[in-house]
Amino acid sequence: MAAPASAYKDRQFLAVIGDEDSVTGLLLAGIGHVTSPPDSQKNFLVVDNKTDNAAIEEAFERFTTERKDIGILLINQHIAERIRHRVDTYTAAFPALLEIPSKDHPYDPEKDSVLRRVRRLFGE
């Protein structure tokens, strides 16, 4: 059953949690957005080896729960692995969660939480 229009009508932005190259490319493509003051929240998080998993989880929570203007959340698959317990338990329709490859880490369909759910659904 489709979600009511009220669930998605204000969700007009993408958010990204990724490495520097992925985030930079998406920002150059025009997805960057900062909310109005006083909180001025960005719709992206650049993750490197020094980024704590807690910071990644906090951004994931903010983009999926707190921000009602995010329609799609893109996350590098190798970063999703760092918070796999949160990604695997995420079931909301909005924002849609998509795992994407990065320059240094190719996409592995065996790790993708959405594809695993589809396989379970079809009994594979």
Swiss-Prot record:
A Pfam family: ATP-synt_F
Membrane topology recorded in Swiss-Prot or TrEMBL: Peripheral membrane protein
Compartmental location: Vacuole membrane
Keywords: Hydrogen ion transport, Ion transport, Membrane, Transport, Vacuole
Primary role: Subunit of the V1 complex of vacuolar(H+)-ATPase (V-ATPase), a multisubunit enzyme composed of a peripheral complex (V1) that hydrolyzes ATP and a membrane integral complex (V0) that translocates protons. V-ATPase is responsible for acidifying and maintaining the pH of intracellular compartments.
Quaternary structure annotation from Swiss-Prot or TrEMBL: V-ATPase is a heteromultimeric enzyme composed of a peripheral catalytic V1 complex (components A to H) attached to an integral membrane V0 proton pore complex (components: a, c, c', c'', d, e, f and VOA1).
Protein name per its UniProtKB record: V-type proton ATPase subunit F
Organism: Botryotinia fuckeliana (strain B05.10)
